[in-house]
Amino acid sequence: MSSHARVYISNLSFEASENQLYEYLQDYNVISVLIPSQTVRGLKNKAVRPFGIAYAEFSNEEDANKVIQELNGKLFMERHLNLRMHIPIDSNKVQIVRKSSVAVVASSTAGADPSASSDTPAEAPEVASALEQQPLVKQLKSRKHRLTPFRRKKREEPAVEADIPEASTENVQETGNNETEVSEAVAGAADANAGANADANPIVTVDPVNSESSDVGNVTTVITEKPVSETIAFIGFIPRNTTDNQLREYFKGFDPQEIVVFKNRTYRRGFTFHRHFTAALVTFPDAFRLNDAKQFATQEKFRGKQINVKNAFIEKIEEVQRALEKKAGANTNGESAEGNNEIPADAGVTGDEPDTANAVAAIPIEGNPQPQADGNDGAVVEPEANAEPLIDQEDGVTASQDNPLLNSNAESQLESQQPVEQVAA
C-alpha cells in the first residue's frame, strides 16, 4: 500500500486537464494528478467526458493538509474547489445485501429467543420463503400487461404436479377430524395425478359409426398443418416489376401452365408504413415437375436473386382467385359505367325549367302586326291582317297609337320578345 497522502478534489471544471491541475498544485510538492472520465461512443466519433472530480497525491500528509487549508474554496477556472482528505474504501467492511434478505434477517433476529420452543426455528424458513417470493409476484404483476392474452391465460392457469408421492392410510394418526381431511386430500391428489397422466398422453378416439357417442371427453382435437397444393408453387419475395413471361422463361424446362404475379401487403406493428412484396403462383402439370422446379431454384438464380419455391397453401390460392374475380368484376363495372355516361340528345331540357317562350306575352302595335311565337313547338305564327288589338287583362285598356304610355310599354315588351323569337327561329 502506498504511503502517499491523497486529496479528493470536487467541483472541478469540466474543461480542466490533468496538466493544468498539476501546474496549479506544483508548489505543494504534488506527485501525481488523476481526473476520472468516461468515454462516450457515438455514431461517428468518441467523446471523453470528465466527472468533475480529481485525485491528487502528495509526498506526505503535511503537504496534503496544507493544500486543503490554503486552496479549499479557492477559485480555479471559474469554479470554487472543494478539497478534503481521501478516505479509502475497505472492501471487507462493505456488504452488498438485497432488501429482501435484510428483511428476513431483521424478522428472524427480532423474534429470536433462547428460551423459546422448538417451533420457532421451523417457522423461520416458511417466513423467509414467503418474503423471498414477494418480489417475484410484484415483478409478474408489473409485467402482466406486456403478456399476450394467450400467454396471460396460460400463466394464470394453476399448475398441476404430475409426480405426487404415494400416501398410505396406515401412517395417518387419528387426530379427530384431521383423518377425514387427510383422506380427502389423498383422493384429490390421486385424481389430479390421473388427470395429469391423461393430459400427458392424450388418446384420440374416432367413432365413425356412432357420431352421437357419449364418450366425448376422450376425443381431442388434432391440429394439422395447412393443406397445400401438389401442382401449384408459391414463389415469394421475387424482384419487383417481374412479369409472367420472365417466370415462364425461367421455368421453361418444366412446362409451366398458368402464372399469376401479385403483390402481398404486410403490416408492421409500430410503423406507419406498409411493406409490399411481389410474389407469384405457378401451376405445373404434375407434382414431379414441381419437385424438379424446386430443386432447380436452389441451384439457379432468378434475375440475380435466389428464390424459394414451395408448395402453395390452398387458402393462398383461394385468396388470389378471389382477388382476380374482384378485379375482373371491377373492370366489367367500369366499362358499363363508361357506357352510361353518354347523355341522350333529348335530355337537355328538364320538366322543372320554366318555358320562356310561353312566359313572354307579345303585344303587337296596331297597324304594324308582328309575328308571334307559338309556345308549344317554338314556330313563328304570322298574325292575320285584320287581327284585333290585344287588350290588357288587368285594366282592359287597348294598346293603340293614341295612347303614348301604352305604346311605350308595348315597344319595351316587343324589345324583350325579339330575342325569344330569334331563339325560336
From Swiss-Prot:
One of its GO terms (molecular function) is mRNA binding. Residues 168-180, 330-339, 398-425 have a biased composition (Polar residues). Signal peptide: none annotated. Residues 140-154 have a biased composition (Basic residues). Residues 5-88, 231-314 form the RRM domain. Residues 109-128, 140-182, 329-425 are annotated as: Disordered. The keyword Chaperone does not apply. Pfam families: RRM_1. InterPro entries: Nucleotide-bd_a/b_plait_sf, RBD_domain_sf, RRM_dom, Rrt5_RRM1, Rrt5_RRM2, RRT5_SRSF_SR. May be involved in the modulation of rDNA transcription. Belongs to the RRT5 family. This is Regulator of rDNA transcription protein 5. It comes from Kluyveromyces lactis (strain ATCC 8585 / CBS 2359 / DSM 70799 / NBRC 1267 / NRRL Y-1140 / WM37) (Yeast). The lineage of its organism: Eukaryota, Fungi, Dikarya, Ascomycota, Saccharomycotina. The gene is RRT5.
